[in-house]
């Protein structure tokens, strides 16, 4: 499968057309961003680590019966995926309080959330990815009620699979975001799952092992990603 015209360049990935209209190629770059893209740096090995991490997670989800856009890994930093008509909202599942939830509600970071919370955010960097709800999403034509219900169902299924996976590596899956799209009238999981889009802490020390290391200038960002990968069994070589 050969890359053709670049369709889209995001903050950390580039999307390319292929000769098959149903398939795209994602290129994972070394770019790392924060503050809605206002701060961007290059971190060596990041594209390779995130591509392999994502491929591993997508396969685990597929093995659990969750349909994703993942087709196959093409190279160290490229993957073949189904072309989805993306729904412009992010689904965020939180098992513990962190990030914007702490700031909005004055919660203590690390407070357990039982049951896990589920939120929707409109994907728009210029607006700061504002929080929205199902009613807004339906009224503005972003998704149907049935599609939103399926996204919520799948998000909680993903949480069940991945909390167990990370727990086995003595890690806490604090929260994560997912993006979904439509493929031949089916809602399936798109985008990626990597430490860029979730929070992961060491179970014993609560050490942050995710993109918060970049956001908060803690250092050793890729080393943390590689540690997580090693502890859950991601093959990095």
From Swiss-Prot:
Keyword Secreted belongs to the record: no
UniProt GO BP: 'de novo' IMP biosynthetic process; cobalamin biosynthetic process
Coiled coil segments of this chain: none
Listed Pfam families: SAICAR_synt
Pathway: Purine metabolism; IMP biosynthesis via de novo pathway; 5-amino-1-(5-phospho-D-ribosyl)imidazole-4-carboxamide from 5-amino-1-(5-phospho-D-ribosyl)imidazole-4-carboxylate: step 1/2
Database matches in PROSITE patterns: SAICAR_SYNTHETASE_1 (PS01057), SAICAR_SYNTHETASE_2 (PS01058)
EC number(s) on file: 6.3.2.6
Disulfide pairings: none
GO MF entries: ATP binding; phosphoribosylaminoimidazolesuccinocarboxamide synthase activity
Catalysis performed (reactions): 5-amino-1-(5-phospho-D-ribosyl)imidazole-4-carboxylate + L-aspartate + ATP = (2S)-2-[5-amino-1-(5-phospho-beta-D-ribosyl)imidazole-4-carboxamido]succinate + ADP + phosphate + 2 H(+)
GO CC aspect terms: cytosol
Entry keyword set: ATP-binding, Ligase, Nucleotide-binding, Purine biosynthesis
Region forming the signal peptide: none
Family classification: Belongs to the SAICAR synthetase family.
HAMAP family: SAICAR_synth
NCBIfam families named among the record's database cross-references: purC
Name the record gives this protein: Phosphoribosylaminoimidazole-succinocarboxamide synthase
Organismal lineage: Bacteria, Pseudomonadati, Pseudomonadota, Gammaproteobacteria, Moraxellales
């Amino acid at each position: 499968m050969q890359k053709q015209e670049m369709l889209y360049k995001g903050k950390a990935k580039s999307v390319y057309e292929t000769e098959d209209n149903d398939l795209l190629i994602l290129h994972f770059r070394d770019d790392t961003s924060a503050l809605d893209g206002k701060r961007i740096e290059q971190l060596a090995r990041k594209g390779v680590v995130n591509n392999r991490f994502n491929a591993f997670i997508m396969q685990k989800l597929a093995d659990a019966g969750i349909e994703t856009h993942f087709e196959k890994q093409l190279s160290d930093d490229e993957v073949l995926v189904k072309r989805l008509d993306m729904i412009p909202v992010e689904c965020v599942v939180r098992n513990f309080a962190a990030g914007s939830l702490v700031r909005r509600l004055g919660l203590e970071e690390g407070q357990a959330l039982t049951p896990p919370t589920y939120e929707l955010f409109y994907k728009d960097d210029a607006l700061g990815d504002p929080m929205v709800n199902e009613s807004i999403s339906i009224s503005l034509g972003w998704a149907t009620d049935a599609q939103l219900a399926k996204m919520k169902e799948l998000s909680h299924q993903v949480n069940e699979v991945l909390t167990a996976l990370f727990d086995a590596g003595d890690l806490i899956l604090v929260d994560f975001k997912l993006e979904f799209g439509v493929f031949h009238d089916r809602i399936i999981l798109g985008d990626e799952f990597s430490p860029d889009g979730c929070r992961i802490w060491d179970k014993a020390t609560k050490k942050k092992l995710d993109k918060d290391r970049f956001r908060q200038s803690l250092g050793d960002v890729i080393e943390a990603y590689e540690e997580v990968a090693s502890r859950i069994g991601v093959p990095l070589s």
